[in-house]
C-alpha cells in the first residue's frame, strides 16, 4: 500500500546527529534545514554530514520576508523599560534584520517579538538609533521573529542570505526548497523562476495576506505548508482552526496538491513519551481534513 502521509522533520542541535539521521532513512520523508538559524557558510558542511548517514531528501527552507532580532545576550525586559534599537548590529543595543528595515520603522509602531508576547513601542527615531519602550514584559532573545502589529511593511520575498544559500544548495544537488512567508502568487512565480523546473518547492502559508490570496496561490504551485506558529502572530490563536479548515477546503478542489501542517503537533513530547489527547485529536482532525 502506498504511504499517504508524509513527514517533514526540522534538523536542529538535538537532531543533527548520526543516530537520528540513520533513523530518518525509513521514517521521515524530508529533512528541513532552516536558513533562519544557519549561515550560508555552514550549509555545505551540514549537507555533507547529513548525507553520510541518510538518503532522506533535504529541504532548504529560506528566511523569506521576516524581520528578526539581533542581540548579543538574551535578557528579560520589564514593562515601561526603555530600549534602544540600532540601525546596524551592535553589542549594546537591539538591532533588526534585514538591517534596511530600520529605515521603514516609524514612531508609534508596535513590535511583537518572539512567541512570549514581548511588545515594544517606538517612541522616537534619530540618526542611527530608535528609542522604544516596553509595553508588555517578556524575554528578548536573538533571532526571534518580529511582527509589526499596527501596519504592514513591505520586505523583499527572499533575503541576500537566501540567495547565497540557494546557490550553495543547488551546487550540492539539493532538489527541495521552501519559501517562508509566501504572500502572493507573484512570490510563487519569482521563487519558481529562481529555482527552475528541476526542483520541488514548498510554499509556506504563515500570514493573513497569504490566507487571503490562497485561492490564487494554490493555482500556481503544488506543495504548501501551513505554519500555525507564525500565522498566529498575524491572526488570533482562536482563528487558527477555522483558517486551517478553510485552506483545506480550498485544497479539496486540487486533489493532486499537498498541504503540510506545522507547529505544536507533538509539543508535549519534548518532555513526555506520549502525546496529549489534544495533540492526538489535532493530528487526526488535520489528516481527516485531507
Positions of PLM-derived features:
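Non-catalytic helical/linker scaffolds that mediate oligomerization, partner binding
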Residues: 1-290
